[in-house]
Amino acid sequence: MTDPNQSLAKSFEPAAIEQKWSAAWEAMGISRATLEAGRPDFCIQLPPPNVTGTLHMGHAFNQTIMDGLARHARMQGANTLWVPGTDHAGIATQIVVERQLDAQGISRHDLGRPAFVDKVWEWKEQSGSTITRQIRRMGASIDWEREYFTMDPKMSRAVSDVFVRLYEQGLIYRGKRLVNWDPVLGTAVSDLEVVSEEEDGALWHIRYPLAQPDAKTGLTHLTVATTRPETMLGDVAVMVHPEDERYAHLIGQAVRLPLSGEADALDTAQWREIPIIGDEYVDRAFGTGVVKVTPGHDFNDYAVGQRHGLPQISVLTLEAKIADTAPATYRGIDRFEARKRIVVDLETLGLLAEVKKHTLMVPRGDRTGVIIEPMLTDQWFVAMSKPAPEGTRFPGRSIAEVALDAVQGGKIKLVPEQWVNTYNQWLNNIQDWCISRQLWWGHQIPAWYDEAGNVYVARTEEEARAQAAAKGHTGAIKRDDDVLDTWFSAALVPFSSLGWPADTPELKHFLPSTVLVTGYDIIFFWVARMVMMTLHFTGEVPFQTVYVHGLVRDSEGKKMSKSEGNTLDPVDLIDGIALEPLLVKRTTGLRRPKDAPNVEKRTRKEFPDGIPAFGADALRFTFASLATLGRNINFDSSRCEGYRNFCNKLWNATRFVLMNTEGQDCGLQECVGDCGPEGALHFSPADRWIVSLLQRVETEVEKGFADYRFDNIASAIYKFVWDEYCDWYLELAKVQIQTGTPAQQRATRRTLLRVLETVLRLAHPIIPFITEELWQKVAPMAGRAKGDGTESLAQQEYPRAVLAKIDEQAEQWVQQLKALVDACRNLRGEMSLSPAQRVPLYAHGDAEFLQAAAPYVQALGKLSEVKVYTDAAAMEQDGAGAPVAIVGENKLLLKIEIDVAAEHARLSKEIDRLRGEIVKCEGKLGNESFVARAPAAVVEQEQKRLADFKATLGKLEAQIARLPVQTA
């Protein structure tokens, strides 16, 4: 623990401080949730990361915001629960373990399901604590005693219970639907696990012969444009727009499907006929205006098929090879090899009209990179739009409808509000949710089958056997091989993590939770589903507010991806990393290994010396400053350096305060009412000013928390500490301590301590480590802590503005003082005086103010003296030839001996040079050819040079105008 009497170290070294306070906070139990009556409740759920994953920048950003909210609530006296958990992450975790086995020459099928699942559990135990250790490194004040894993027995029981109840309510069913199919993983995947990017492809124009030539036009065929010739084997129709004058008269007729001969694809006699249909889905301007319809392999075609009652033909196997339902000519061939053969055969038959280059969006599995195939398979679904039966909490209303009403009725608030439209649009167009996955790792679906295919859905195998026996079946039953979508268990977290289905005190206190902090990319996949499931099973909304933040991207706005080599590891930003290991990290696991040289080149340019250690506080402050309401967060690590400098500034300011208050009379026992020149405490305008500004900052910070504007919080704290407290008040305080009366000195020391102690409490939710370390030193001195090391800053009261302490008169006084000091500094700069060169300043104007301000101006302006005149003429005479500054009603003369003629000549020469540079710049920028052809950065640089030249010219012209008039 901190010894408050031990002097503060000379420099801020974050590593040791972070390690010390992480351990101390856990030992003190500062994050342990309380359930006290009469106190407000605050709850926040950690979006459960992959149990075997590692912390990425999105996690670190998200957790900075959540920790700021949790610490703020805790300091405001709320029963605060931050629920931690990790997700089993079915696909991601299974892939990792399968790759480990592949390296040993073993497949999961060699092991069998039970042994493979055991291997996954082993991997979970080995690596499962990595991410929680990394979360701790960020300073997250989480109640780790309540940590769950989505496949813990309690969580698994809740999952089974929900599945069974939904099935019994008729809201879960099994059916054949089109899903995203990853042929490498051999499972359905969610939309979130599909990445669609533009790729170069082709548009094949294929002639489909009309079953009967068109008597009206003599047309013998329709030309169909497609990007996927291989799926034409499963075509069941061609369609045109019903208002397309070229083809509308053909609706109801038929074409013969090329290459559809069952035994011989090229035998035209075997080709089957398919209808020509009309549908407004067709874009008349795309391709030829005629589109093939393949409901078994295209989501849009599936919807068309449903509207028109068309059959569904699957011509691909689950391994993405041509199936036995297709012509024998192509069976067993890989889909892309089949594409090549089909194109050749069409060309042979004279049915390939043309091939055009075409850019299209190609869906790929984010884990495998393989092209995703829409596939008709038997899957389990949750009915999203079906009315719930009697006996449920919302009978007659669908799950989606109830979730829509929760936001529209104001029970859930989305911040910013723009995301309400996104939420509503998705729920208004929702499809039934495919919840089954063809994996071995995950919650196995609680359904069993007998030999006749009858299904028994139950919480346990014993229950399933009892159901089977009740129906007269006494033979063996087999459990469904599939597991549930990871998002299914994640959707239950708001209530399952609090002990549901048991009726627990935690559910009473913390459901609904106060706020959910999440990226906009999972509004559909997680947020909406939590709303649906929580309302359906508890009648409560899962959370009162959803704070939707942007996604962390690199400094150029590109998505961070390990496969692209542009990721940053938050722990590397905290601890630092040398260049060589950083290069290894960034060039390993690239999606395109050939990109490694470019990634290395970019990394060497961006981080020539590796990444320095910034510490967790600097990283957190950077994240907070970037937390705007925009869609993207472009992360530039150079900003961390600025916030590391802020931490150093705060550290050094604290050292100054302690050195000037330790062992001194700080007036803490004096009554503040006993103030004034004759009292025990005499607060100056500067003292009252900094306290007044502090109230304004406290108000701004509180509004920032209320509005979830962490960027405003960070900005307010930064500006107050750096610009006002450090740059101005500490300098003014030095003067007061050196020249003031005992009452003024006591008041100054008291103000230094009390303002600093308040600032440390104010900034603690954003930068917890450094503020805790400094508070342990400052608080006892400020009379705010016992000083025995048993108290934590995290448990103190959060500052609240006292509006009565706002002193506009003092603010105005210091504003005038700042203007005087700035004017004096400008005069020194214009006259090129060195800091060591001390000269007198003559002043005339508001004599009372100038007299009071003189000690400050002398010290901060590095002057030998400040002489205040009541007679303007006398000042002009004494300061003849001195440079002048006018500040409001006050006139300042910097008494300096100069060679007027030489200075005039020097300034004139520089002015002439600048005018010449301006002419050159204006000539360049006035040249249309230069502006049009030069890179934007070059033009921008030239514009900046012109602006700088003009600004400098203005200063020099003002400076030469102030020189005394030369007489012959």
Curated annotation (Swiss-Prot):
The record's listing under InterPro entries reads:
aa-tRNA-synth_I_CS, aa-tRNA-synth_Ia, Anticodon_Ia_Val, M/V/L/I-tRNA-synth_anticd-bd, Rossmann-like_a/b/a_fold, tRNA-bd_arm, tRNAsynth_Ia_anticodon-bd, Val-tRNA_synth_C_sf
Q: Which GO terms describe its cellular component?
A: cytosol
Which EC number applies?
6.1.1.9
Q: Which residues are in coiled coils? A: 800-831, 898-963
The signal peptide, as residue positions, is none
Q: Please classify the protein's predominant subcellular localization into one broad category.
A: cytoplasm
Record GO terms (molecular function)? aminoacyl-tRNA deacylase activity; ATP binding; valine-tRNA ligase activity
Function of the protein: Catalyzes the attachment of valine to tRNA(Val). As ValRS can inadvertently accommodate and process structurally similar amino acids such as threonine, to avoid such errors, it has a 'posttransfer' editing activity that hydrolyzes mischarged Thr-tRNA(Val) in a tRNA-dependent manner.
Q: What is known of its domains?
A: ValRS has two distinct active sites: one for aminoacylation and one for editing. The misactivated threonine is translocated from the active site to the editing site.
Protein family according to the UniProt entry? Belongs to the class-I aminoacyl-tRNA synthetase family. ValS type 1 subfamily.
Q: What is this protein called?
A: Valine--tRNA ligase
UniProt lineage: Bacteria, Pseudomonadati, Pseudomonadota, Betaproteobacteria, Burkholderiales
